[in-house]
Amino acid sequence: MYAVIRSGGKQYRVSEGDVLRVEKLPAEVGETVQFDDVLMVGSGSEVKIGTPHVEGGSVKAEVLEQDRHRKVEVTKFKRRQGYRRHHGHRQPYTQVKITGISAG
């Protein structure tokens, strides 16, 4: 069984046991989170497509890690002017493991 969920403005195709990184969620490591924004659920030849969500569909996941991605560095400069700017950014994420999918 698989599902397509929306989290943090992105869509993910997930199955039970999958480990994925989503935008930061307000949960502690070891807690269980539930994604109710299920767009599609499928198993074998049977597929349920939501309009826009599958009624009663939910995906449960366990939080494995709260961390930040590797640093993305941006440098801008103008030649011959002594103008240099350097900026770095690390986006926070939550790593989750899918524990259950319910079609509703």
From Swiss-Prot:
First and last residue of the signal peptide: none
GO CC entries: cytoplasm; ribonucleoprotein complex; ribosome
GO biological process, one term: translation
Spans annotated as Disordered: 81-104
Keywords: Ribonucleoprotein, Ribosomal protein, RNA-binding, rRNA-binding
Basic residues compositional bias, start-end: 81-90
Protease in keyword set: no
GO molecular function, one term: structural constituent of ribosome
Pfam families from the UniProt entry: Ribosomal_L21p
Top-level taxon of origin: Bacteria
InterPro entries referenced in this protein's UniProt entry, alphabetically: bL21-like, bL21-like_sf, Ribosomal_bL21
Functional note: This protein binds to 23S rRNA in the presence of protein L20.
Family (UniProt): Belongs to the bacterial ribosomal protein bL21 family.
Record's subunit section: Part of the 50S ribosomal subunit. Contacts protein L20.
Descriptive protein name: Large ribosomal subunit protein bL21
Organism: Halorhodospira halophila (strain DSM 244 / SL1) (Ectothiorhodospira halophila (strain DSM 244 / SL1))
